[in-house]
Amino acid sequence: MSNPCQKEACAIQDCLLSHQYDDAKCAKVIDQLYICCSKFYKDNGKDSRSPCCPLPSLLELKMKQRKLTPGDS
């Protein structure tokens, strides 16, 4: 498995570039990355790593701040 959630991470870069780095306009793609990463950690364990995903503790905080649950899509 190479770089899980890379597609979602690249979508964030594309979105930010096309919206002059206004992250508010990219909230949906950011949420999609967090949901993908949550699934990645659920499937592979919290000791797994992907360069595209924040560490599990930060991911949990970000998902809580954005009111996301792992089952969202």
UniProtKB/Swiss-Prot annotation:
InterPro entries according to UniProt: CMC4, Cys_alpha_HP_mot_SF
Q: List the disulfide bonds.
A: 5-36, 15-26
Motif Cx9C motif 1: where?
5-15
Q: Which GO terms describe its cellular component?
A: mitochondrial intermembrane space
Q: Where is this motif: Cx9C motif 2?
A: 26-36
Location in the cell reads: Mitochondrion intermembrane space
Domain CHCH: start-end pairs: 2-44
The protein's predominant localisation is mitochondrion
Query: What does the entry's free-text domain comment contain?
Result: The twin Cx9C motifs are involved in the recognition by the mitochondrial disulfide relay system.
Q: What protein name is recorded for this chain? A: Cx9C motif-containing protein 4, mitochondrial
Q: Which gene encodes it?
A: CMC4
